[in-house]
Amino acid sequence: QQTRLATSTDGLYFTPQAPLLGPPYFRATRLDGVIYLSMWEGRLGRMTSWEGPVELAPPIHDGYHLPPHVSGRDSGQPGRQIRHGHIFAHDGRIHMTFSRIGDAPERCLHCEVVPADDWADWRFGPVSDLLRPAPSWEGGDLPMRPSIMGTAWDRLHELRDPALFTDNGQVYMAYCGGAESGLGIARVDGL
C-alpha cells in the first residue's frame, strides 16, 4: 500500500493524483503552515503542500522512528510497536494518539509532540492512557493478552487505531473496539 492525494468536487467521488506521496496509513494535521504526518509503524513526516513532496523523518532513535517510551521498546517486551499513530493539531500544540502492538491490553494512548526544524530535536512528552477496553463490544469482558500484528478476525480485549477530531470546538476520538469488531466515538476533555 502507498498513499496518494485524491481530490473531489462533491465529497462522494474522488480522483487520485498521479504522484505517490509515501508509505501507507497517512494521517495528517496542519499547524503554522506545516502539514505534519504520521504513518504506519510510527513513521513521521512533514510537507508544506498537500501535493508534496514529503520529507520523511529519519530513524534517529537507535534505528527507530520514535523514542522507546513512545514505541514501547522500553518495556523489555519484544515485538512492541505503534500500530497506527494519529497526529493532531489542537490549540497550537501537536498531539499523537496511537495503540501499540504487543500491549496487554492494546489501548488508546496519547503523548504531546513538540516538533522542530531538525528531526533530532523533536520532543515527545510522557505517554498516558486515553481509553481502555470496557466490557461488552469493546472487548473488556474477554481475556487480556498481548496483541499481535495483523487483522483481528474475532472480538478481542483491545482498542485500536485512535484518531482525534473536533466538532463545534469539542475534541472527540474515533477508535476501533473489540480489536476490529466495532467503531466508537468518545469525547476527549483536557487536551
Cite the ranges covered by each PLM segment.
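Beta-rich carbohydrate-recognition and catalytic domains
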Residues: Q1-H84, F88-H157, T166-L191
